[in-house]
């Protein structure tokens, strides 16, 4: 993110006397849910609100630990998850990111795609055969998102896809699942409930 061709390097800001904090929960490095907690603590220290930040970080850590305890009691093959967006007229967009992959790994699940893609079709969806579909609502797809899931799940072509057949299509907002903040933990808890009932 911090490159000369985009917003400038960290060094260039520092040379101007502008302090820079680069989040651990970042698209630039491999991820862990614990990075979110550490960012909260670090930002609390930067803004001199350590007590409030540490209390919030402790709460987040407790939720992560509780979630990991639940996951550790389960066994079986990882469930296949598809992050889908922009469904319209039989085509869709698929997402993958380091944080979403980290979240899935923590839940004993995996993204059906190594990387995202545009212009995917229902035939692609059938081939992916996901156990769970996370339909990601986004502002840029606002015109079609309102009835996208209904249109998808009623299409005859995909009725044997496990996520459709077992009614495992979850709707989430883009920021809740694709960004790198505390809301990812909310999404992980929501997704765990679907994974638990799908396994």
Question: Whereabouts are the PLM-identified features?
Answer:
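Binding-cleft/active-site segments that stabilize strongly anionic ligands or cofactors
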Residues: 1-27, 66-178
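A conserved helix-loop-strand patch within extracytoplasmic ligand-binding domains
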Residues: 7, 26-52, 61-73, 78
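Structured C-terminal subdomain patch of bacterial secreted/periplasmic proteins
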Residues: 31-47, 52-54, 58, 135-199
């Amino acid at each position: 993110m911090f490159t000369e061709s985009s917003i400038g390097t960290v060094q260039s800001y520092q040379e101007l006397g502008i302090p820079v904090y680069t989040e651990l929960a970042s698209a630039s490095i491999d991820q862990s849910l614990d990075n979110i907690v550490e960012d909260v603590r670090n930002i609390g220290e930067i803004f001199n609100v350590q007590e409030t930040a540490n209390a919030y970080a402790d709460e987040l850590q407790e939720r992560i630990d509780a979630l990991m305890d639940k996951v550790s009691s389960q066994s079986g093959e990882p469930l296949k998850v598809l992050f889908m967006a922009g469904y319209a007229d039989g085509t869709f967009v698929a997402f993958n990111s380091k944080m979403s992959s980290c979240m899935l790994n923590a839940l004993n699940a995996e993204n059906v795609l190594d990387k995202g893609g545009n212009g995917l079709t229902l035939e692609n969806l059938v081939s992916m055969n996901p156990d769970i579909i996370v339909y990601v609502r986004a502002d840029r797809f606002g015109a079609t998102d309102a009835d996208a899931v209904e249109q998808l799940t009623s299409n005859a072509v995909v009725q044997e896809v496990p996520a459709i057949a077992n009614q495992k299509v979850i709707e989430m907002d883009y920021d809740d699942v694709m960004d790198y903040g505390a809301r990812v933990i909310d999404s992980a808890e929501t997704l765990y409930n679907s994974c638990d009932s799908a396994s």
